[in-house]
Amino acid sequence: MHHSNKEFNFFICEICNLVFLNPRLPLKELEEYYTDIYLPYRGTSAWGKYKKLVSLSQRGLDIKRAKILKQYSFPNKASNILDIGCGNPTFLEICSHFFKSSLYGIDFSDNGWKREQERFKKLNLKVGDIDSLGKKFSPDIITLWHYLEHDYYPNKTLKKLASISNSNTRLYIEVPNYDSLSRKKYNQNWAGFHTPRHTFIFSPKNIEILLNKNGWQVDLIDLKGTLDSYVLSWMSEMEIKGLDWSKSLENQFWNYFYGMVKYKLKHLFTNKSEGVMTIIAKKLEM
């Protein structure tokens, strides 16, 4: 899922089954894979004339995630909500309608919002990493929607987040699940690998170990996740076909739509993880 034919290798830990990219690209070189044509930065505009229809789907996903925050964290006016790897910050935009909290987004590039600064002007968006948040900043809710698999130093990140959190802070993470049905089906073409941007691929066992090691206690692991599992499946199919992700997806819309209907009917009664998982954790009491 990148603009070159370069091959990348993943290895698996025999003890905890953590999958990791080795060798990893130097961070400077990695920037070439996060340009403004990167699909999450392009957002719904990647779908051309079907942008509005896809926007409705994205809005539904953002609302679903906001409702999870409401269910487990009860945000209020005094709450600080931090979205790490915010990309195109539509999730925070939805949170601004749901809650009267202070909303913060951080990403190492502004490619996700620089073209729509007026739209997102009420959000506190920052280019940088978590070390640039400041020692006095304390989030009540932290979300990492498909961020942690990109992080070169997840131990450091989670430990840092625990250090700036309060006793009531809740952490929400969503990542591809290596133990999922779609990974077993597509193997090396699985979109969850997303080389070379994804450096770690987690499963329920090792992500709980990782969180516990760095100051967090897992409350819930939802093996269904919030992202529609069809998205990962469709992207895997497109990987096999060699789709150029930098081009417009307008011509793929109806293929995507009809495929989704068939997928939904086929997987109507599936209870196993089909692609992603959501983890909710709280700060460990010392």
Positions of predicted regions on the chain:
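A short glycine-rich, Lys/Arg-flanked "PGG" loop and its adjoining helix->strand segment in the class I
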Residues: 155-170
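Short, glycine-/aromatic-enriched active-site segment of Class I SAM-dependent methyltransferases
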Residues: 173-200, 205-210, 234-237
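Conserved N-terminal segment of class I S-adenosyl-L-methionine
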Residues: 1-145, 154-158, 223-224, 243-246, ...
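Phosphate-binding active sites in nucleotide-utilizing proteins
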Residues: 150
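Conserved catalytic loop of SAM-dependent methyltransferase domains
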Residues: 219-247
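A SAM-dependent methyltransferase catalytic signature shared across enzymes that methylate proteins
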Residues: 205-224
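Short, P/G- and charge-enriched loop/turn segments at secondary-structure junctions
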Residues: 263-271
